Curated annotation (Swiss-Prot):
Name of this protein: Aspartate carbamoyltransferase catalytic subunit
GO CC annotation: cytosol
UniProt cross-references to PROSITE patterns, sorted A to Z: CARBAMOYLTRANSFERASE (PS00097)
Pfam families reported for this sequence: OTCace, OTCace_N
Gene: pyrB
Origin organism lineage: Bacteria, Bacillati, Cyanobacteriota, Cyanophyceae, Synechococcales
């Protein structure tokens, strides 16, 4: 395995192919250990992972904490409502405080885009050894979700082996609220890195035309594009036509808590046009994989019948795969600091 080059993980925009492969190979090894009956290993014994979640979370928060515990790390959790934030302390000072307590990795979720960059810069300025791992920041990025989504697709298409080349030229359809989705942005970087052709489908209020240029926009602190050959992004307004040619589908929920104005005429009309149903899926002559990062709004962006009965609905696979992916990220960051 290559030497891990990152002290902090903010975004997949700065990931090279070797970075992806390092994460996937290590996650696969951790997954194999679990499947053999070994649920806990001493890889990070004596280290401290601190979970700083300023937004609600079920999957990501618990997945990171379980990942840390399976590596035998100590886990410190944070509750905003009972912290000094209520007394006026800043988020950055909170992070510095936990670093001073000995946190080796801060896993951070917050509503402000790019906040993890600010925190990491402050920590580095005081020569802290603490790593920062972005667990979702505003509209910007959700790298661990992007990684687990691509890992799930690779395992599906390569029949549970690990061949990232299987995504090359695959048509991956992403449906819904791309504009307000940090998951979608991470998926765009990761899918394109492996040569997938991406179709974004939804109304213009949720997928503006400029998303076709997304991959041409430099990421913060990105000196050069680490991946030279990418797939392409196209935009469709017809879900039915998009489903006909898709090799896989990623469904996004409506991020109503991030919408600053009413962008839809009604939820019912959105569901009618862009909700994924068994009837619409029947337009594709293959049983293609369906992903959703959760939480699900049943019978709005995806029908309960698809979630519960469609044979290649991989939502639970995503949740399961999130644990070894996050184990890999925590392990790589800590080994970088040793």
């Amino acid at each position: 395995m290559q030497i891990w080059p990152h002290k902090h993980i903010h975004s997949l925009a700065n990931f090279s192919i070797k970075d992806y492969e390092s994460v996937f190979e290590l996650a696969n090894r951790f997954d194999a250990l679990k499947n053999s009956g070994t649920k806990k290993i001493p890889a990070l014994q004596g280290t401290l992972v601190t979970s700083l979640f300023f937004e609600p979370s079920t999957r990501t928060k618990n997945s990171f904490e379980l990942a840390a515990k399976r590596l035998s790390a100590d886990v410190q959790t944070f509750a905003p409502s009972s912290s000094s934030l209520t007394k006026g302390e800043t988020i950055i000072d909170t992070a510095i405080t936990y670093s001073a307590m000995g946190a080796d990795t801060l896993v951070i979720r917050h509503s402000s885009s790019y906040i993890t960059f600010e925190i990491a810069e402050k920590l580095d300025a005081i020569n802290s050894k603490t790593s920062v791992l972005n667990a979702g920041d505003g509209l910007h990025s959700h790298p661990s979700q992007g990684l687990l989504d691509i890992y799930t697709l690779i395992k599906f298409f390569s029949k549970n082996t690990l061949n990232p080349g299987v995504l090359n030229s695959k048509k991956i359809l992403i449906i819904g609220d791309v504009n307000h989705s940090r998951v979608a942005r991470s998926n765009l970087w990761a899918l394109s890195a492996f040569g997938a052709d991406i179709i974004l489908c939804g109304p213009e209020t949720l997928i503006p035309d400029e998303f076709t240029n997304f991959l041409k926009t430099p990421a913060p602190n990105q000196i050069e594009d680490p991946v030279k050959s990418r797939g392409c992004i196209t935009i469709s307004r017809s879900l039915e036509e998009s489903i006909k040619i898709a090799d896989a589908i990623i469904v996004l929920r409506l991020q109503k808590e991030r919408m600053m104005e009413n962008l839809l005429s009604s939820i019912d009309s959105y569901s009618l046009d862009y909700g994924l149903t068994s009837e619409k899926l029947s337009l594709n002559n293959k049983e293609i994989p369906i992903l959703h990062p959760g939480p699900i709004n049943r019978d709005i962006e995806i029908s309960s019948k698809v979630v519960d009965q469609y044979p290649n609905c991989l939502i639970n696979n995503q949740v399961s795969n999130g644990i070894p992916i996050r184990m890999a990220l925590l392990y790589l960051l800590q080994k970088n600091n040793q």
